[in-house]
Amino acid sequence: MAKLSLINREEKRARLVKKYAAKRAELKAVIANVQTSDEDRAAAYKALQELPRNASPVRQRNRCQLTGRPRGVFSKFGLARGKLREYAMRGEIPGIVKASW
């Protein structure tokens, strides 16, 4: 089980990403627009840089919803490989069966 502080940190990052998503998208659209003046583009760059660092979605880490494990997480299920196997063997995940050929 991951430390509770690390799990809370990830939740805080997720909240920040959600909070600033619209503003980030707006600034990135201004930057990407070829008709934007150089002054406006520079201002948009500066505003984008002044947003909180953790508001960027790249800083988020996929974690297991049960254990908080950061590695070996299947994003389709939101579970780490160990918990995924455990639940699949018990038949608690619909549509997952043990391979046999």
UniProtKB/Swiss-Prot annotation:
Pfam families: Ribosomal_S14. SUPFAM superfamilies: Glucocorticoid receptor-like (DNA-binding domain) (SSF57716). It comes from the Bacteria. Keywords: Ribonucleoprotein, Ribosomal protein, RNA-binding, rRNA-binding. The keyword Mitochondrion does not apply. One of its GO terms (biological process) is translation. GO terms for cellular component: cytoplasm; small ribosomal subunit. GO terms for molecular function: rRNA binding; structural constituent of ribosome. Part of the 30S ribosomal subunit. Contacts proteins S3 and S10. Belongs to the universal ribosomal protein uS14 family. NCBIfam families: PRK08881.1. Binds 16S rRNA, required for the assembly of 30S particles and may also be responsible for determining the conformation of the 16S rRNA at the A site. This is Small ribosomal subunit protein uS14. The gene is rpsN.
